[in-house]
Structures are given as structure tokens and as C-alpha cells.
Amino acid sequence: MAKMKTKSAAAKRFSVTGAGKVKFKKMNLRHILTKKAPKRKRKLRHAGFLSKVELKVVKRKLLPYA
């Protein structure tokens, strides 16, 4: 059986931490920021982590060698 390929789109969007969690950057912080509240923009600066259900799918299907 051939080796599985890592999905390059997923590799660009997700990174795996040392503890095995999958980290990603939150959306909605690129442009049209004037109508967004400062509190919302502040919360969007922090990284997001996948839930356990999503974690299994992403690690198995998209990032097999992570």
C-alpha cells in the first residue's frame, strides 16, 4: 500500500502541539475590522484548539504523520 499524503491545505492551517492537540488560527480578523467590537477582536487573536471529535478526523485523514 502506498504512503498516505498529508493534505497541504490542512498542513498550512493546523499545527500539532507537543501534547498532541491541534491548534489553528481563528477566522474574521483580516479585514472589515471597524464594525467588530474590541472585545471580539481581542478574543480572535488567541489560537483555537480542535475538539476531541474533530481532532480524530483531522489527525487520521488530513495529517496522518503529525
From Swiss-Prot:
MF annotations from Gene Ontology: structural constituent of ribosome
Superkingdom of origin: Bacteria
UniProt keyword list: Ribonucleoprotein, Ribosomal protein
GO cellular component, one term: cytosolic large ribosomal subunit
Protein name, entry field: Large ribosomal subunit protein bL35
InterPro entries: Ribosomal_bL35 (IPR001706), Ribosomal_bL35-like (IPR021137), Ribosomal_bL35_CS (IPR018265), Ribosomal_bL35_sf (IPR037229)
Protein family: Belongs to the bacterial ribosomal protein bL35 family.
Name of one Pfam family that matches: Ribosomal_L35p
